[in-house]
Amino acid sequence: MKDDFIMFPKVDFAFKEIMRNETVRKGFLSAVLRIKDTDIKSVVILNTNLPKVHSDEKQGILDVRLTMNDNTEIDIEMQVCSMKTWAERSVFYVSKMISEQTHINKMYSNMKKCINISILNFNFTDKTKRFNTTYHICEDTEHFKYTDIAEWHVVELPKLPEVSDGTDIYDWAKFIKSEKREDFEMLAKKNNYLKEAYNQLDIISQDEQKRLEYTARQKALYDYNELMHENYTSGYEKGVAEGKAEGISEGVLKEKTRLAKELLKMKSMTLESIAKCTGLSVEELNALTLA
């Protein structure tokens, strides 16, 4: 019997399962890249097997690698855990996608365009309030493209406004961010691509084996977030404690120095007596007399 359980698309396991559907891939890319769906002739998924062990699994990264129209390679990454070096990481992977082509194509003119699409469940930049941004390699002054070989698209889910801006990418971001079946049903009425995405999500949500894998993945991401939070909290508390101790130590030293200076001015006590009284060494007292 069908229950009301529904997976969250922002959990990368669920997102990747949805992307196995070619119709969904076509609709998603049309929205993100802002191109006509009729211009997308084919979208072939390259890494068809979801890895059991992934080099970035602890950081919550699973990607979908595609080739579009046989002339463009696309890497879609869903990142649920905050990462300060995301820009550098995405540049590295696009560079890797480009360099991998040299093993096949010896002519630079034959290299495919490489695109990274990052769907982030954290704020990537504070330089703009827009939830969707696009980046190229451009000339500094007039901003024309140096090359069209590389391109980056970033979708920041936390920045998604409540009111739609009327774009297809807004509807897709809303779909990925949603957690309630009624929200998915509403979005499915927007267009056939989102309808297909919801149908696919519903199918995998009722698959017992996929549900087990989804739950395991969700737990792994939760555990990672908890570990990062604990490390941050313990590090912060340790820093505060060390700061307090250092502050107290500096305060005591300043008071000893002040007292020593007063006693030295009086010239009624020997250096040895002042040293015993203040806890400073004779050498330190001599330094004060020369200061």
Write out the residue ranges for each language-model feature.
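Conserved single-residue anchors adjacent to enzymatic active/cofactor-binding motifs
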Residues: M1-R211
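Short, charged alpha-helical interaction segments and adjacent helix-coil junctions
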Residues: K2-F5, P9, I74-Q79, K174-A291
